[in-house]
């Protein structure tokens, strides 16, 4: 996507950057360059060092040694304010907005001459096709819209170096295309973009160059056109991976507790004409031992439905039947006791206590069930069981959840849900922002859970993920399910997209 072969001095040149945490080398002499008008994609497994490198460039974290050259000027260390002044803006994977401020206030926060910025903000909103009510509270937005607000904050600051950390993780294909169109306009003005993503098709579409990090080093770097997909995947995950959980992992993953066993195919969760905030007249059945996909565009009402099932939102009409009994009036805790468990979309704000220990987080739901009191030895043993089952990487049980990479945080959250002995497991965007390796681990895990006759409701914006994982698929459009479940050959990206966009005519698969 580079607009010209003639390039001036690099916008950014990181040289021999080292960083260590608690005696562990996180970055080992990294060299990284970004030119004007180019997209440089940065890939790597969870814990490879991508986020640490970007935080150093953005002035959030100091390097132990090394230099940053910004448009020809050398710096040993930056602060966030200085980085902003130099035109560097990091759009984080987990949006950092003020939930009690309006969308407009969040976008304009920290800017001078706010009145002069209003027209620019409106122009950006129009260019990206955003339909925000600027006076709404940021806390009311879903993850995809919060991500877009963060990107707008960066664009409002006339950033010359824009770092996008998984910017499309929760965006629909249409929203992604609008974003890419806007990024192309920025590239034409000489802006350079560091694009962190695990989606190889998107990277091939937008990136001029690719660098792959592994274990704190640059394992592979080159022009996108010269690197094969096999080269990239091999650089990210050099070890040969098993296609399914090992026998040992399956042994450690046997779900705890006296969970009622249902024969595969037994209806476990039934929704009858459910109406609530963001959805209406939703009916479906979820069976033991199946993975039921719930697809739809962002804003279709999927997360609102999931939160209502778990008791986090008020049900306005209809019935929720769990094992043949209505649970409409039960609290979240009572639903949890009956085996209804929810893995939320936003792991950092809703799923984990980032300042609590890993052992505490894994056992958090069972703490509540037994009176909140933690038992350290038992919790540590539980964490060790899931470490072996899920291949979670950490140093000690007492370390805070925030110290883990995104993929390992997600595995801790999954372990937390499994420890509650689910009969029904609702997973909302379970692979958002995790790398290829961790994504495969999670897929294997969900299949293993379903094989134990747990009923799994998989909510995902990744239609290829839905196609790969789901036994049946319902598609929500503007808060409703207007079609019967897709099955077998009907489960494909094209058909799902058609229904998601409200196409009343879908092609039935021929027998």
From Swiss-Prot:
InterPro entries: AAA+_ATPase, ABC_carbohydrate_import_ATPase, ABC_transporter-like_ATP-bd, ABC_transporter-like_CS, P-loop_NTPase. Disruption phenotype: Serina et al. reported that the transposon insertion mutant is unable to grow in rich medium at optimal temperature (37 degrees Celsius), whereas it can grow in minimal medium at 37 degrees Celsius and in LD broth at 15 degrees Celsius. In contrast, other studies showed that the gene is not essential for growth in Luria broth (LB) medium at 37 degrees Celsius. Part of the ABC transporter complex LsrABCD involved in autoinducer 2 (AI-2) import. Responsible for energy coupling to the transport system. ATP binds at residues 44-51. PANTHER family: AUTOINDUCER 2 IMPORT ATP-BINDING PROTEIN LSRA, CARBOHYDRATE TRANSPORT ATP-BINDING PROTEIN MG119-RELATED. Its main location: membrane. This is Autoinducer 2 import ATP-binding protein LsrA. One of its GO terms (molecular function) is ATP binding. Belongs to the ABC transporter superfamily. AI-2 autoinducer porter (TC 3.A.1.2.8) family. GO terms for biological process: autoinducer AI-2 transmembrane transport; quorum sensing. It is found in: Cell inner membrane. It comes from the Bacteria. Signal peptide: none annotated. It is a peripheral membrane protein. One of its GO terms (cellular component) is membrane. Keywords: ATP-binding, Cell inner membrane, Cell membrane, Membrane, Nucleotide-binding, Repeat, Translocase, Transport. The complex is composed of two ATP-binding proteins (LsrA), two transmembrane proteins (LsrC and LsrD) and a solute-binding protein (LsrB). Its EC number is 7.6.2.13. It is an enzyme of class 7 (translocase). Induction: In the absence of AI-2, repressed by LsrR. Induced by AI-2, via release of the LsrR repressor. In the absence of glucose, induced by cAMP-CRP by direct binding to the upstream region of the lsr promoter. It catalyses: ATP + H2O + (2R,4S)-2-methyl-2,3,3,4-tetrahydroxytetrahydrofuran-[AI-2-binding protein]Side 1 = ADP + phosphate + (2R,4S)-2-methyl-2,3,3,4-tetrahydroxytetrahydrofuranSide 2 + [AI-2-binding protein]Side 1. Residues 12-240, 240-503 form the ABC transporter domain.
């Amino acid at each position: 996507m580079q607009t010209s072969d003639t390039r001036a001095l690099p916008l950014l040149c990181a040289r021999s950057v080292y960083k260590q945490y608690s005696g562990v080398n996180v970055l080992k002499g990294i060299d990284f360059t970004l030119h004007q008008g180019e997209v440089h994609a940065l890939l790597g497994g969870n814990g490879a060092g991508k986020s640490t490198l970007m935080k150093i460039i953005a002035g959030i974290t100091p390097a132990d040694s090394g230099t940053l050259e910004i448009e020809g000027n050398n710096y040993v260390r930056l602060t966030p304010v200085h980085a902003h002044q130099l035109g560097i803006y990091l759009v984080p994977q987990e949006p950092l907005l003020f939930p009690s401020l309006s969308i407009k206030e969040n976008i304009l926060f920290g800017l001078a001459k706010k009145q002069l910025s209003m027209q620019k903000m409106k122009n950006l909103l129009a260019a990206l096709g955003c339909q925000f009510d600027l006076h709404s509270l940021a806390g009311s937005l879903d993850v995809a819209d919060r991500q877009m607000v963060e990107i707008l904050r960066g664009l409002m600051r006339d950033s010359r170096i824009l770092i996008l950390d998984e910017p499309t993780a929760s965006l629909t294909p249409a929203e992604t295309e609008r974003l890419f169109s806007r990024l192309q306009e920025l590239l034409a003005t000489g802006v350079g973009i560091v694009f962190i993503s695990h989606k190889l098709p998107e990277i091939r579409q937008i990136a001029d160059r690719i660098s792959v990090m592994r274990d704190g080093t640059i394992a592979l770097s080159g022009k996108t056109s010269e690197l094969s997909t096999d080269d990239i995947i091999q650089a990210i995950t050099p070890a040969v991976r098993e296609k399914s959980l090992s026998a040992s992992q399956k042994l450690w993953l046997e779900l705890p507790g006296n969970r009622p066993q249902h024969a595969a195919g037994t209806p476990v969760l039934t929704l009858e004409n459910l109406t609530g905030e963001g959805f209406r007249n939703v009916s479906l059945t979820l069976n033991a031992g199946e993975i039921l996909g719930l697809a739809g565009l962002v804003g279709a009402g999927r997360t609102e439905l999931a939160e209502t099932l778990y008791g986090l939102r008020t049900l306005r009409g209809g019935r929720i039947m769990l094992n043949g009994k209505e649970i409409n009036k039960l609290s979240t805790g009572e639903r949890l006791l009956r085996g209804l468990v929810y893995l939320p979309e936003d792991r950092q704000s809703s799923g984990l206590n980032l300042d609590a220990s890993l052992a505490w987080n894994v056992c958090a739901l069972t703490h509540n069930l037994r009176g909140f009191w933690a038992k350290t030895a038992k919790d540590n043993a539980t964490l060790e069981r899931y470490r072996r089952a899920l291949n979670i990487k950490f140093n000690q049980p007492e370390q805070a959840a925030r110290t883990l990479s995104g993929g390992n945080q997600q595995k801790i959250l999954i372990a937390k849900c499994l420890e509650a002995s689910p009969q029904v497991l609702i997973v909302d965007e379970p692979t958002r922002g995790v790398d290829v390796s961790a994504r495969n681990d999670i897929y294997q895990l969900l299949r293993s859970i379903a094989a134990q006759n747990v009923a799994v409701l998989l909510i995902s914006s990744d239609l290829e993920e839905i196609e790969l994982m789901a036994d049946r698929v319902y598609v929500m459009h503007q808060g409703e399910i207007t079609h019967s479940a897709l099955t077998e050959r009907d489960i494909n990206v094209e058909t799902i997209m058609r229904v998601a966009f409200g196409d009343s005519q879908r092609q039935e698969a021929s027998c």
